[in-house]
Amino acid sequence: MLMITSFANPRVAQAFVDYMATQGVILTIQQHNQSDVWLADESQAERVRAELARFLENPADPRYLAASWQAGHTGSGLHYRRYPFFAALRERAGPVTWVMMIACVVVFIAMQILGDQEVMLWLAWPFDPALKFEFWRYFTHALMHFSLMHILFNLLWWWYLGGAVEKRLGSGKLIVITLISALLSGYVQQKFSGPWFGGLSGVVYALMGYVWLRGERDPQSGIYLQRGLIIFALIWIVAGWFDLFGMSMANGAHIAGLAVGLAMAFVDSLNARKRK
């Protein structure tokens, strides 16, 4: 038996299980704090996870509703059907995921109102020896973003990856990954470019590396990242390193973040195997 995912809303879980039944895949639901979805035939895990990704994008798709009607599990008052986008946001994001997203948005708004330089004077990596004991600076550089595309790209990945880690492994694990990767990726980046940088991408790359390798080595963890996405991450790092797009990228933070995530996943998966 392999646990595929968990849903806070049992009726959302049932909708996914009903749909997979129409595709010839039998899933079961076990109720604990959340509705855990389990797969008996582990050879179908790749297919189920691909379908799950599509389901989370739009759980209100008519094919899922039709599957629930066919199975006799539908009914009225399903708010996730009426507001699928916000339901998907709530379904995947835990409190730490939300707090980080809100903090980044608040800082971004402040940068638009006060200007980048004013905010960076308070949040940037220590740019003067006198600031080295302002410990928040070693982490708050991750909250700053310099364009709408920059913040949207990072927060989308943060929600997708950070939410998965928090839902499956707990808020504590997400906090640890975030703090370690922000600290180490920031340290490496300031060696490359000095202290004037910002963005959540170092943490995002750490989450990419962590989710991918942990899923590969410890499928029972319930987190998973398609190999195509980790390949995309590597291509993006190479493109940034050789300046193929003419964009200013925090290449040091990306590489360091990815390395941190892979290392933490390797250690955690080893510990998980020892406990079995």
Curated annotation (Swiss-Prot):
Compartments where located: Cell inner membrane
Transmembrane residue ranges: 94-114, 142-162, 169-189, 192-212, 229-249, 250-270
EC number: 3.4.21.105
Gene Ontology molecular functions: serine-type endopeptidase activity
Pfam families: Rhomboid (PF01694), Rhomboid_N (PF12122)
Membrane topology: Multi-pass membrane protein
HAMAP family reported in the protein's UniProt record: Rhomboid_GlpG (MF_01594)
Biological function: Rhomboid-type serine protease that catalyzes intramembrane proteolysis.
Protein family membership: Belongs to the peptidase S54 family.
The protein, known as: Rhomboid protease GlpG
Species name: Shigella dysenteriae serotype 1 (strain Sd197)
Gene: glpG
